[in-house]
Amino acid sequence: MEGRQYYPPRENVEGNRTTMGGGPHSPWHSPVPYLFGGLAAMLGLIAFALLILACSYWRLSGYLDGEENQSRERDLEVGDVKPDKTAVKPVALPEKFLVIMAGNVKPTYLATPSVKTCTCDDDDDEDDDVEGSDQVVPRSSESNGETH
């Protein structure tokens, strides 16, 4: 190295009274360990959440309890299990719909759907049925299968 001179770092500058560090350099002064540490923490949290979801799914399906062959919902397509003769069939209840009417004091109503057959000649009879009814009646022609 011709022409260049090497000056070693000075321990103490007399005018400033500051010392130039000769101590060990810490890797925590860089943002890289924090970046990878945060990334590892997030991936660990995601893995933990997926583990919780998998365990709760297995518990609800009866896999961990050994009830996979004793469940009530048997696969009848396989053919090895006969349908249960003593099973109680559910009672068919009428369907109810929640209709929200905007602008009223109490805007919530329960309605029973009804199919109304409409003819084009009988317009007066249609208005009489709708006035005294609390039921929701579809007005479109597609809902009852007729075309005009």
From Swiss-Prot:
Intracellular or extracellular location(s): Membrane
Ranges of Polar residues composition bias in the record: 138-148
TM segment ranges: 35-55
Region (Disordered): 1-24, 120-148
Membrane topology: Single-pass membrane protein
Tissue expression per record: Expressed in the vascular tissues. Also detected in anthers.
Motif, VIMAG: chain positions: 99-103
Membrane topology, Cytoplasmic segments: 56-148
Keywords attached to this entry: Amino-acid transport, Membrane, Transmembrane, Transmembrane helix, Transport
Coiled-coil spans in chain: none
Further facts: Overexpression of GLUTAMINE DUMPER 3 leads to free amino acid levels accumulation, plant size decrease and to an enhanced resistance to geminivirus infection.
Biological function: Probable subunit of an amino acid transporter involved in the regulation of the amino acid metabolism. Stimulates amino acid export by activating nonselective amino acid facilitators. Acts upstream genes involved in the salicylic acid (SA) pathway and in the geminivirus-host interaction.
Family membership: Belongs to the GLUTAMINE DUMPER 1 (TC 9.B.60) family.
Notes on the domains: The VIMAG motif is necessary for the function of the protein.
Protein name (Swiss-Prot/TrEMBL): Protein GLUTAMINE DUMPER 3
Organism: Arabidopsis thaliana
